[in-house]
């Protein structure tokens, strides 16, 4: 996939245009939607990036902000901002915090950075995060197909415009590959650095097989 690099006023690299910062919860119940986001983004010729793929030697906050700065787009899923089951019950603030960093970067760093909010239920974000009033979240209803539908809505202006049916085909093959990745890495979780990179790599290959316009740009 071709990579376009934008250079800022100071001469330093601002973002890579085909990379998307993916801000999602890292838990097993979210795995079907995790795979759907990867399949959907790769179907548009984009490359998902996430905090979990960056070496732990760097400070976490620095890693997050560095990734956001290098991405033209960021996707933020707020569907799991809820109390966890571990005592004491604590709300999960990572996703809205990372969304805040992306909004700040758009406001004072690079106005061309596009950020999108995803949720499972309509109107819930307006209640839990009222500062977002005026921003319409993309409602996926907690379903992989819903994720794919909303990804196509969010990216309607992109050069590549795969159909939901084409994205579902990519997802179907990626789910099979995910089973093999778990087996090869001897892990039960896909939320690891190596597993994430393998998923993105495989999804990119699958996408080029199914989306004709992607083959024309490679």
What are these regions (language model features)?
Residues 85-154:
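Cross-kingdom TIR/SEFIR domain
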Residues 128-217:
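C-terminal interaction surface of TIR/SEFIR-family domains
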Residues 48, 74-75, 109, 115:
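Hydrophobic beta-strand scaffold residues
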């Amino acid at each position: 996939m071709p990579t376009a690099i934008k250079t800022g006023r100071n001469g330093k690299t601002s973002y890579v245009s085909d990379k998307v910062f993916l801000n999602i919860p890292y838990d097993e119940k979210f795995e079907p939607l995790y795979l759907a986001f990867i399949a959907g983004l790769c179907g548009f010729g984009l490359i998902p990036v996430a905090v979990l793929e960056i070496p732990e030697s760097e400070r976490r906050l620095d890693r997050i902000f560095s990734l956001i700065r290098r991405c033209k787009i960021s996707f933020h899923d707020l569907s799991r901002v809820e109390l966890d089951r571990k005592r004491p019950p604590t709300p999960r603030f990572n996703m809205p915090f990372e969304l805040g960093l992306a909004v700040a970067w758009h406001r004072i760093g690079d106005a061309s950075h596009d950020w999108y909010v995803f949720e499972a239920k309509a109107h819930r974000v307006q209640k839990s995060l009222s500062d977002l009033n005026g921003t319409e979240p993309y409602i996926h209803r907690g379903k992989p197909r819903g994720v794919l539908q909303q990804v196509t809505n969010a990216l309607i202006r992109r050069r590549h415009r795969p159909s939901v049916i084409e994205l579902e085909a990519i997802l179907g093959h990626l789910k099979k590959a995910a089973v093999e990745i778990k087996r090869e890495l001897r892990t039960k979780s896909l939320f690891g650095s190596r597993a994430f990179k393998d998923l993105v790599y495989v999804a990119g290959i699958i996408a080029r097989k199914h989306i004709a316009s992607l083959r024309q740009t490679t």
